[in-house]
């Protein structure tokens, strides 16, 4: 394959891209428009062309690309992408590594991107968007925290103001919205919470489905050492940043990068190209999005590309992205390697500066590279032509060595008025000094203090579950139960253990955790009651990568609510913080319930079940806690998010509707059980009616169920239609509106129905017991054709 590439732009980023792409055996020629003094090398693979990168140049660029049989276009800067360069080339059949105009709005409009993050529950600073100056000022006056003022549109990286007081914030709003310091970019502003912490730059390739992130980098925006002085386009960077631990990067990928790519696709603006996300790592260790960029960062690109492994072909990776097959190519970085970039600027930058000074470059250390930015070639001499002129990047086995090498490279560059910072990567060494005294348990990712806070928050709630036989005091090593005090004569103990499953993913996505606590109890106690047992005690296990005290407290509060509904005591549990096993705030939960049943009351009594016995059904509250892998797949297929309005209940979000907790059937069934009015009960969980009813049937008998005897809840109608799920399949996965069934003698149906209706149950007579030889399956469903 002989690939010709058109690379649009003229900065250090574009030189680094051209340098790396030229190493690919796939690449025959790289045309850089307009390029700089470093990309002007017609004797090699790289050649400048005298066409600009602004919107008025798009037609010329397309014409040139067609004339040269270009097979891939790579826009470097954000402006052409925001202005729709991808559309111009797509119309003539030339693929572009970069997002469409609609997708590029993620960088082109900060208000759009903030609203997107809010919609898709992507962690970011609290914010409000404004087009009205007076309303913006009123908000600044009333808000109770320090703020950042951002011009919504593109402002060449300068449209962010960080005031230190309310007065300064009001002045900043005026500067942006009324004085038009950033032109039309300031017609709309984002006023957001000021976040403190360390920043990370995460560059990630995406084909619209898969996302592959590069090692985390940190850049240096301020002109002066110690991050003092005016903002710049970036005075240096280093990679990988030590604070970007594997656990943190996994959390960023799962809570930010993948949800961003998935959300854009579902919103009809799939993202193809390089997603560059600015992350703030707050003091509590949580990553939050500062901003999205839809292209390679500068100077991060100059720092990261030299770290790609020798078997990683950048051209092949980019082609894989545009061909939607990123998961099929190799993308690796060199092991045990560090890179540092030192940017050299013209004297006076970022304010007024001189151009036209001659540049010379002497001998460089091994694995040290020079990338041109604001340079031009004039009569064979490279001269200064911009504010950030040139950069030295070095790769070495240690960060310390990479810093030393990069500065040696910078020393080899000479031009009049040259300036560079002397402290690139200082944050990495500062962080190392902080931990030199030894590693604490908290630094390993486990907070004893947070665990203690959780216990204090849930103590009273747990205490409210006390019942005869126990005291429900937490904080010890377990719990005791006095069967005699609970009134049992000759009991058998019955145990059940279960979890909530992938329903937890929905709870985590919309930050609502109380109802899944009820689910956990329900899944266990319903399995006890079908054995005739009264639930007595409950214990929960909650495991997470990083303990969010409020989320865990809400979850345990839900567990306590479920215990109260079931009449059992929450006597203990375990909260495990396990970074590396779980990532970020993701969690899993399991519960165990112990109950008791008198020896002569154990269910099912299969010897009593006979032909003609009635099967009664009690309604479910919805999907309950099984089948959510199918449910989530249907939601994805439908292109919905959990914050969208629920299709079958517009008063709720989709996530809220799906989190309706599993019904607990204990208190309404115990009187029926104690009166020996039922011979068997079945909890309809995973496997649906088809798989669960056979558990209670004796040999030679089957169940015949008429699904027209109860109304199919709207949630199941919608899921079936939206996923086009075969009825045979959905009936083996979801409960379809019946959460519990009872086998009852025909002569007892009226009495059982009356008992259950007294406590508010709606009872449906849904089928009967039939001999095996009358049907083909152990559970036969009829009239399913009318479901949806």
Curated annotation (Swiss-Prot):
EC identifiers of the protein: 6.3.4.13, 6.3.3.1
Taxonomy, superkingdom: Eukaryota
Keywords on record: ATP-binding, Cytoplasm, Ligase, Magnesium, Manganese, Metal-binding, Multifunctional enzyme, Nucleotide-binding, Purine biosynthesis
Residue ranges, annotated region (AIRS): 439-752
Binding sites annotated in the UniProt record for ATP: 140-201
UniProt-annotated binding residues for Mg(2+): 291, 293
Family label: In the N-terminal section; belongs to the GARS family.
Protein name per the record: Bifunctional purine biosynthetic protein ADE1
Organism: Yarrowia lipolytica (strain CLIB 122 / E 150) (Yeast)
Organism lineage: Eukaryota, Fungi, Dikarya, Ascomycota, Saccharomycotina
Gene: ADE1
